[in-house]
Amino acid sequence: MARYIGPKAKLSRREGTDLFLKSARRSLADKCKLDSKPGQHGRTSGARTSDYGTQLREKQKVKRIYGVLERQFRRYFAEADRRKGNTGENLLQLLESRLDNVVYRMGFGSTRAEARQLVSHKSITVNGVVANVPSQQVKSGDVVAIREKAKKQARIVEALSLAEQGGMPSWVAVDAKKFEGTFKQMPERAEIAGDINESLIVELYSR
């Protein structure tokens, strides 16, 4: 299945919440009705959503937030299930430690899609080595940086400026002047978006 390249706001409306696919710092809530489904008048239904439907919707939402395709997502879940601890939390930690997400969390990209592009275009290094695989897992202590040739890109400078104003996660330490950051540790569940109900995804795959 190909990656979705259509209107980002449409996906947020479909999930009924801002997935921050267009900007991490500016909410879509003021621009469109997130409680209305896509369509000329917003599709409505009087039917109650089944448990399976609710679980599936939550999985779709998380896939879209992190820009992960179905096959990748299944692999992440399988790995999360193999690890000790809470499977749902393990899943979110695996997604959060993807290189494209870490680049986004450090403020080098205004969206995960933009961060993914920076990685694919070889504008990012990990521990001094050029990295171009968005799904690369970042480990505690890894240093992620913008390559010298990309430091003057307006989109990176602007994204970093906005991130500094909005604040960054406690599990990354960023030196904006050097355009680099350190992945201090895996984020705790409380440090990851609270509007995700990962237990629904665990229930879905446990069927």
UniProtKB/Swiss-Prot annotation:
Q: Where are the transmembrane segments?
A: none
Pfam families, alphabetized: Ribosomal_S4, S4
Q: Which residues form the signal peptide?
A: none
Q: List the biased-composition ranges (Polar residues).
A: 42-53
List, for all copies, the residue spans of the domain called S4 RNA-binding: 97-160
Gene3D superfamilies referenced in this protein's UniProt entry, alphabetically: Ribosomal Protein S4 Delta 41, Chain A, domain 1, RNA-binding S4 domain
Span list, region Disordered: 31-55
Q: Which Gene Ontology terms cover its molecular function?
A: rRNA binding; structural constituent of ribosome
Instruction: Provide one Gene Ontology cellular component.
Output: small ribosomal subunit
Q: Which UniProt keywords apply?
A: Ribonucleoprotein, Ribosomal protein, RNA-binding, rRNA-binding
Q: Name one GO biological process term.
A: translation
Q: Which NCBIfam families match?
A: PRK05327.1, rpsD_bact
Self-association and partners: Part of the 30S ribosomal subunit. Contacts protein S5. The interaction surface between S4 and S5 is involved in control of translational fidelity.
**Physiological role:** One of the primary rRNA binding proteins, it binds directly to 16S rRNA where it nucleates assembly of the body of the 30S subunit.
Q: Which family does it belong to?
A: Belongs to the universal ribosomal protein uS4 family.
The protein's name in its UniProt record: Small ribosomal subunit protein uS4
Give the lineage.
Bacteria, Pseudomonadati, Pseudomonadota, Betaproteobacteria, Burkholderiales
